[in-house]
Regions:
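N-terminal Rossmann-like dinucleotide-binding module
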Residues: 1-46
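Active-site loop of classical SDR/Rossmann-like NAD(P)-dependent oxidoreductases
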Residues: 11, 274, 296-308
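Hydrophobic residues in well-ordered beta-strands that form the structural core
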Residues: 12, 92, 117-119, 248, ...
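Conserved SAM-binding strand-loop segment of SAM-dependent methyltransferases
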Residues: 48-55
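Beta-strand-loop-alpha-helix segment that lines the small-molecule cofactor/substrate pocket
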Residues: 66, 72-73, 77-124, 139
Length: 350
């Protein structure tokens, strides 16, 4: 199956491209990027494909069956919609879009075209996350009444002044960049419960004085002090569902010293703490004694799992848990948190 990668930045090189290269049924025909040197560098690094600048050239090729959209958030909807209408199957990196309205338009076009539109919520292909989901589905934790997600860093604002910190491009900050993963894990593991109300507050504090922002390292590029910083660097929220209450506390940067990145699933029979990107611990009691253990199992690369499943679903027609229909609720929740923060009130979802 001939595929193309649109956007040849960090996530493309770290995840999408190597995973396609490792899939025997995939052949990368195009590397596309608006910066010609990036596309050409990919051709030279991986020894295959053709470098192009305009993604419309990719979509015009009838041999291309699937594309990965790995661009900045602001063009996720446009490129994905154009690709769907050109008859291509799409894996669009997270977040699907900057706003819930944009995500709805993507979903609408997917329904019209019938082509695949999956979103890069890669943790749905994480073996650790899927084992937690099985614990919950099998009733091992009993009634899950509360889930808390913490995605807090001491100093981790990406590319200060660049695309990540410009609302017109990214759509938001810590919530839309990191929170999307945590909220998606919670919803997935808990069976995608219906959301009733959302309350939240987003803060832009540590990065607003860009030249005064102290840090030890900065991913996504060096600071651009003549750039823009108008997104949230921290966020808090509470989401009431027909299942558990979900609370969240996230930050690219806070004065906390140590990073705190985990999810606590709290049930009346047991609990689980997932250390993000790592293993998890199960807490319970048995025969009057408290128990605590870490399951031991083989962890496969979740990005490889994601790409393999994407290729397979195109061939078989199987609908994946990362399909736009399933994950669009995350876009709605994030939008509601931002709306709640701006309006200073609780948001009710229909």
């Amino acid at each position: 199956m001939k595929v193309a990668v649109i956007g040849c930045g960090t996530i493309a090189n770290a995840a999408h491209i190597p995973s396609y290269m490792n899939n025997p049924e995939a052949e990368i025909k195009y590397f596309c990027d608006i910066i010609p040197e990036r596309a050409q560098a990919a051709v030279e690094k991986y020894g295959c494909g053709t470098a192009v600048v305009d993604y419309h050239d990719v979509l015009a090729d009838p041999e291309v069956e699937a594309v990965s959209v790995c661009t900045p958030n602001n063009v996720h909807p446009t490129i994905s919609i154009d690709a769907l209408r050109a008859g291509k199957n799409v894996l669009c990196e997270k977040p699907a879009a900057r706003t819930y309205k944009e995500a709805l338009e993507m979903q609408k076009v997917q329904h019209e075209t019938g082509k695949v539109l999956n979103i890069g919520v890669v943790n749905r292909f994480n073996d650790s996350v899927n084992l937690i989901k099985k614990y919950i589905d099998d009733g091992k934790l009993g009634n899950i009444y509360h889930v808390h997600a913490s995605f807090r860093a001491h100093r981790s604002i990406p590319g200060l002044g660049g695309a990540f910190t410009t609302k017109a491009i990214a759509g938001g900050g810590a919530l839309i960049d990191w929170g999307v993963h945590y909220l998606d894990i919670v919803m997935y593991c808990c069976g995608d419960p219906k959301v009733k109300t959302v309350t939240g507050e987003a803060f832009c504090e540590l990065g607003k004085d860009m030249k005064g922002y102290a840090y030890t390292d900065m991913w996504a590029g060096s600071p651009k002090y003549d750039g823009t910083y108008d997104v949230d660097d921290s966020v808090v929220g509470m989401i009431r569902t027909e299942g558990p209450v979900i609370s969240l506390h996230g930050a690219w940067a806070q004065n906390i010293g140590e990073n705190e990145c985990y999810i606590d699933f709290m049930g009346d029979k047991g609990g689980i703490r997932l250390q993000y990107g790592k293993d998890f611990t199960v807490y319970s009691s048995e025969y009057g004694a408290l128990t605590e253990y870490k399951p031991v199992f083989k962890m496969r690369d979740h990005f490889q799992n994601e790409i393999d499943a994407f290729i397979d679903c195109i061939k078989t027609g199987k609908k994946l848990p990362s399909h736009i229909d399933t994950v669009i609720i995350t876009a709605q929740m994030m939008q509601a948190i931002y709306d709640s923060s701006e309006q200073h009130k609780e948001i009710t979802l229909g």
